[in-house]
Amino acid sequence: FLSKSFNADQFVRAGKVVHIPNAGAKLSASVGPISRPKTATETTDTELTFEIKEIYTDPLYIQNADKYELSYDKRDAVLSACRSALSDKVATEILKSWIGTTTKTKLIGTTFSRQDVLKAQTKLNEQDIPQEGRYLLLDAKCYEELLSDLTEVQANAFLATANASTGVVGKLYGFEVMLRSSLINGVSAFAWHKDYVCRAQGDHEMFEQEN
């Protein structure tokens, strides 16, 4: 789901801080007749700045004998496990940043249903969020509840729009639905538009020491 966001890598400074320039508030238009001369007003830029979190794994020791005595490449196995752990942690931390603590709007009840997806669609419509580029991320339980709420015809139509190559498990009410085993504490479903959230990657390093 991380790829469904604005890539801010080009705005990373010194590998630690993201600085994104912004044109400021949305402009308004007026209806004539026009009084002339018009006085120009200066635009005020607003800046989006945030720090990149440092995410790491603890060092691991591989005995020298393991390089020769094991039937598999232990170093590659350890590196693969580290990459997997880092990727999962990065995804969780970015999701926390997207959801935040004060700006999210709770729409669902005790059981997730297609009506909750419709409510999310209505909320984004009210905010003039573009139709194209809307996504909905569900945890495993919400996904099960959603499928259970659909009729057989609705479920077949939903699953027919799945795209494994992009991670989309189906489309419903304008959302491309994605699945993750879990989101963050207290959140089971999250709807967003790809141009209203961003991601950025700083420097990454691996350290090794051989005896």
Predicted regions and their residues:
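Active-site-surrounding "flap" and adjacent substrate/cofactor-binding loops of secreted or lumenal enzymes
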Residues: 25, 34-46
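Residues immediately flanking
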Residues: 23, 64, 140
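Extended, solvent-exposed, turn-rich assembly/linker loops in the middle of proteins
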Residues: 100-169
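Short coil/turn connectors at secondary-structure junctions
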Residues: 15, 57, 131-133
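Alpha-helical scaffold segments that mediate packing/assembly in large oligomeric complexes
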Residues: 63-129
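Sequence/fold signature of self-assembling virion shell proteins
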Residues: 1-4, 9-28, 46-52, 59, ...
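Generic, well-ordered alpha-helical segments
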Residues: 12, 40-44, 52-54, 70, ...
